[in-house]
Design a protein with these regions (language model features):
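Glycoside hydrolase catalytic-domain context in secreted enzymes
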Residues: 1-230
Length: 230
């Protein structure tokens, strides 16, 4: 096409993309066909720029009006959140080689202190509110990736929770894609935290597939843990 011909032999420094409405505005439409068309726009531009994985959509619950990323999330309603994320995923993944990353799994509903926060959630609230949207999206659209969250959940780092990753996400929801950490999750330690740092070997043991962005230290830690286990 014209764009491809114009860019042939050129190094792209800036990716000019179509601006679509924020997540909350999309959800207010209650129109999954429209949201899927927005995903189609994203997928088309991903193809054009050679982008294979989109680090979105995010479907955490609007629990507090003080959460600085509420604009990125869809709703306080897990049904709406799941349906919107599924529609967006279908639109993007209709394009060959393009995938979405739904996040942040799970119970990441505030920005302040989120690397040290321990979300205490009952089983009922977890099932009815905080996991439901993820289950809907996985079952209806099978996103290519799921990103775990920075926070702890009932005392366990989400990336280290085999219950969340293997028992619920994979076995119960039927998820088939990759599970990645949020950025530098195994290295987000803080001396002010009452909890230990998330550790790479425990993330791997829980079923995590990809450390982002990863480094040699993480690889060394996992290899040593594997050798010790043998």
């Amino acid at each position: 096409d014209v764009c491809s011909s114009y860019l042939a032999g050129c190094e792209i420094k800036t990716q000019y993309c179509t601006a679509i409405p924020i997540g909350t505005a999309l959800a207010q439409s209650f129109d999954t066909d429209f949201v899927q068309r927005c995903g189609d726009i994203v997928g088309e531009e991903m193809e054009h720029f050679g982008v294979h994985l989109w680090l979105a959509p995010a479907l955490n619950i609007h629990r507090s009006i003080r959460c600085g990323r509420n604009f990125e999330y869809y709703s306080e309603d897990p049904l709406v959140s799941g349906k919107m994320a599924a529609a967006m995923t279908r639109g993007v993944q209709a394009h060959k080689g393009c995938g979405t990353t739904i996040k942040h799994y799970a119970a990441n509903n505030k920005e302040y202190n989120r690397t040290r926060n321990n979300s205490m959630v009952s089983e009922r609230a977890m099932r009815e509110i905080y996991l439901k949207g993820f289950g809907i999206c996985v079952r209806e659209a099978q996103p290519k990736a799921v990103m775990t969250s920075y926070n702890l959940l009932n005392g366990t780092h989400t990336a280290e929770s085999r219950g969340l990753v293997m028992d619920i996400l994979r076995a119960e929801f039927g998820y088939q894609g990759i599970v990645m950490t949020d950025w530098v999750t195994p290295m987000t330690g803080d001396a002010r935290s009452a909890h230990r740092d998330s550790q790479a070997q425990y993330v791997a043991a829980a079923g995590g597939d990809l450390f982002m962005p990863g480094n040699k230290g993480i690889m060394t830690t996992c290899c040593r843990a594997s050798t010790a286990a043998q």
